[in-house]
């Protein structure tokens, strides 16, 4: 028997400074603080919970994580907001592109305060472009 995975419940990241990291996430994304503990903070919205724990960040251990957005209009708005907020975006001037060569999905990539790599993507975005 193989176990079918459901939606991601939450994921945890080791970060240098949970307070600074939580502030960064909340300044850039629709996330609310839902709990605190001695060494960390949990942020959440209707789709995801991110637990930021004080520790040594290891961004190279995760290639990247991707969040889907509704459509290309939303992705373009996100790009504008991230630029305005000074977020470390990949491929300056040509930020939106295929998730992988030949993929119909379009996205953009950025890095958080600890160097973790993230993606915002639109499924079948190439058809909407």
Question: Language-model features: where?
Answer:
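Vicinal oxygen chelate
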Residues: 1-4, 8-16, 44, 57-129, ...
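Short secondary-structure junctions
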Residues: 30-36, 88-93
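N-terminal beta-strand motif that seeds the catalytic metal site of vicinal oxygen chelate
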Residues: 1-20, 49, 62-65, 124-129
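Amphipathic alpha-helical segments
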Residues: 17-32
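Short glycine/proline-centered loop/turn elements that form peptide/ligand docking sites
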Residues: 20, 38-41, 100, 128
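Conserved short beta-strand elements that form part of the metal-binding/catalytic scaffold
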Residues: 32-63, 110, 117-122
């Amino acid at each position: 028997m193989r176990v079918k995975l459901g939606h991601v419940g939450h994921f945890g990241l080791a970060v240098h400074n949970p307070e600074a990291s939580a502030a960064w996430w909340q300044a850039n994304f629709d996330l609310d603080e839902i709990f605190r503990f001695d060494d960390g903070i949990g942020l959440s919205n209707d789709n995801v919970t991110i637990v930021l724990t004080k520790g040594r960040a290891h961004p190279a251990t995760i290639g990247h994580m991707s969040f889907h957005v509704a459509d290309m209009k939303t992705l373009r708005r996100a790009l504008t907001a991230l630029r305005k907020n000074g977020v470390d975006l990949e491929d300056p001037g040509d930020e939106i592109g295929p998730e992988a060569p030949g993929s119909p999905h379009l996205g953009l990539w950025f890095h958080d305060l600890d160097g973790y790599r993230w993606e915002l993507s639109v499924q079948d975005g190439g058809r909407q472009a």
